[in-house]
Amino acid sequence: MQHYVTPDLCDAYPDLVQVLEPMFSNFGGRDSFGGQIVTIKCFEDNSLVKEQVDLDGKGKVLVVDGGGSLRRALLGDMLAEKAAKNGWEGLVIYGCVRDVDVLVQTDVGVQALASHPMKTDKRGIGDLNVAVTFAGVTFRPGEYVYADNNGVIVSPSPLKMPE
């Protein structure tokens, strides 16, 4: 597992990276994570999140535009454990998570706005692999995202940690 330090990446690639507005907190078992972006756009319905974490996620980060909802949790312990089992590097969720005491022990990165105990509906509503914009940045499928306790950054191409 690669360790990322976003301040070092920002120093090394200042003209390449975009930095998200500082509104995310780390809820996962990994202090840092990064990888190729897979996007989901959904609102209080995590059907597509459930589908994607069942797939091979090696080298990938699931970026979920949940509309910033603070009323439902788009990720909980069961889906986080599936994501870890299937090799996902992490998830960046513009929305809430739950089961935070379990998430912090799960080997997957999770950045989200807050915790909320209520689960979502599963109506099969949402879009996969579309450009999504939140926190002042547009995420495009196939680009790259890196996260740690300092923040979250996006790059059009993969970044290497400076030596």
Curated annotation (Swiss-Prot):
Cited CDD domains: RraA_family (cd16841)
UniProt xrefs under Pfam families: RraA-like
Protein's UniProt keywords contain Hydrolase: no
Catalytic activity, EC: 4.1.3.17, 4.1.1.112
GO terms (BP aspect): regulation of RNA metabolic process
Reaction equation(s) it catalyzes: 4-hydroxy-4-methyl-2-oxoglutarate = 2 pyruvate; oxaloacetate + H(+) = pyruvate + CO2
Keyword Metal-binding attached: yes
Domain of life of the organism encoding this protein: Bacteria
GO terms, molecular function: 4-hydroxy-4-methyl-2-oxoglutarate aldolase activity; metal ion binding; oxaloacetate decarboxylase activity; ribonuclease inhibitor activity
Enzyme class: lyase
NCBIfam families: NOT-MenG (TIGR01935), PRK09372.1 (NF006875), PRK12487.1 (NF009134)
Similarity comment: family membership: Belongs to the class II aldolase/RraA-like family.
Protein's name in the database: Putative 4-hydroxy-4-methyl-2-oxoglutarate aldolase
